[in-house]
Amino acid sequence: GFMGATYWMVPDESRTELYSTKLAYFQLVLWTVMGLVTVTGYLFRYGTGNKLLEQPLPSKIVIVIVMLMFLYNIAMTIKKSGRFTTTEGVLMGGLGLAALLYLPALLEFENYTVAIFYRWWTIHLWVEGVWEMIQGGFLAYLLIRLSGADREVMEKWLYVIVGLVFIAGIIGTAHHYYWVGVPSYWLPIGGLFSALEPLALIGMAIYAYSAIRRSGLAHPNKLALHWTVGSAVFTLFGAGLLGLAHTFPSVNKWTHGTL
């Protein structure tokens, strides 16, 4: 999903055409075939058995190749245009880190406890780290286009997002650390910082909606505008409130701790 959205956003933001449409289609075909083969393999018990990262090694290698092709295509598009915005920078940072943080998934450990420890470096730092950077980039782009919000102000919010992601997201990984040999003080610290992650995205949406009311701007595509702001609201209730409900150590040991 975010690959397709990026292929739309970056050329529009850079005011140029995509570097290679053929490469994008080849990437899509390769990704689709890999997904179908991998899921079919699960039916025959062909997988690693590592929860959430069950893909066999050949599939993981294809995922890495697809991500590298994707990043190359996007980077060359930006280079061709000569225009590079903060919105694109945050998006590219998130996409690059998404590829980088998948590398721990390629490692294999005989000790399952060690495997659990490093698994969250991919799963948590994807979901509650770089994906929020990616979402922030998309959200800023849409709000600038749809609400008439000031680009400079919106991009300042992106810096806040990056800061919260690196502080709250990275430290928040600790709320997964049950029975893996780390000191117990990491559990409440991880739970606290995990609850801070959606705040910047909500603030950005509130600012944009306030800007609409102040300026009286009525964008003709009201559905897209409300869907965009609604995405941030869902982030508040999903990643924020529901996420907070199970980051408390007494709850999380039954949700994540037993994985």
Q: Where is each model-derived feature located?
A:
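Short, flexible helix-adjacent loops and helix caps
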Residues: P11-S14, K80, W179, R214-L217
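Solvent-exposed interhelical
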Residues: L18-Y19, R151
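Non-cytosolic membrane-interface motifs at loop->transmembrane helix junctions
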Residues: G49-S59, T85-T86, V114-L125, V182-S194, ...
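Juxtamembrane/interface segments at transmembrane-helix termini
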Residues: I78-F84, E110, S210-G216
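Hydrophobic, small-residue-rich membrane helices and short re-entrant helix-turn-helix hairpins
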Residues: R83, A115-R119, H124, S147-L158, ...
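Anaerobic metallocofactor- and corrinoid-dependent redox/one-carbon enzyme cores
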Residues: P220, P249-G257
